[in-house]
A protein has these predicted regions:
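Hydrophobic anchor residue at the start of the ABC signature
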Residues: 40
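Short loop immediately C-terminal to the Walker-B catalytic DE motif
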Residues: 57-58, 88
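Conserved ABC ATPase signature
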Residues: 26-30
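Conserved catalytic motifs of ABC-family nucleotide-binding domains
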Residues: 47
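Conserved ABC ATPase "signature" region
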Residues: 4-22
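Catalytic Walker B motif of ABC-type/P-loop ATPase nucleotide-binding domains
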Residues: 51-54
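ABC transporter nucleotide-binding domain
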Residues: 70-156
């Protein structure tokens, strides 16, 4: 990039990643989230055709996470963006296609919706007694729980739902799929 073009691009990218006010600060004085945003801006400076991002929203507060996630979606229109992350919501909102790797091996590759559909009928919700919670946490993949009066509603990701409880089939999410694939053997 030529100097003038680089200056303009830097100004634009700093505004995009919400670092305009910190433009003259040393990088060492930045918080973790600020450093993350600065690295994303730096990676985009030469307008690469392929962009590889590792945990791009790690350490960001929810407002900044959404802003960066939306920004990544925008730039993905005209470039290939590969994201490695454990932040499932980032993938749900950004990705057209998802590649799941486990121990370096390809587990699955498809659209978010098709992957989630693979575990249809494997996600259930049910009410349990408070005393039963530890049993379910020790023996099932519990993806969520909340208190409902004197009971607890648990969301399980399982091939074998308990037979002695009234269960409701729930719509699976990408987070449920993550638990199903990466927490097998629980």
């Amino acid at each position: 990039l030529k100097k003038k073009e680089a200056k303009e691009k830097i100004t634009q990218l700093l505004e995009t990643v919400n670092l305009t006010d910190a433009a003259h600060k040393k990088l060492g004085a930045f918080s973790g989230g600020m450093k993350q945003r600065a690295l994303i801006a730096q990676a985009l400076l030469n307008e690469p055709k392929i962009l590889i991002l590792d945990e791009p929203t790690a350490g960001l507060d929810p407002k900044e996470r959404i802003k960066i996630r939306n920004f990544i979606s925008e730039i993905a229109e005209d470039k290939i963006v590969l994201i490695s992350t454990h932040v499932v919501s980032d993938i749900e909102f950004i990705a057209k296609e998802i590649i799941l790797l486990k121990r370096g091996k390809l587990v699955s590759h498809d659209t978010c919706q098709n992957l989630v559909n693979e575990i249809a009928n494997k996600v259930v919700e049910m009410e349990i007694e408070k005393e039963e919670l530890k049993y379910f946490q020790d023996n099932y993949r519990v993806s969520n729980l909340y208190h409902n009066d004197d009971k607890i509603v648990v969301r399980l990701v399982t091939d074998n739902p308990p037979e002695n409880h009234k269960i409701t089939i729930a719509n699976p999410t990408l987070e449920d799929l993550y638990l199903y694939i990466f927490e097998q053997g629980m």
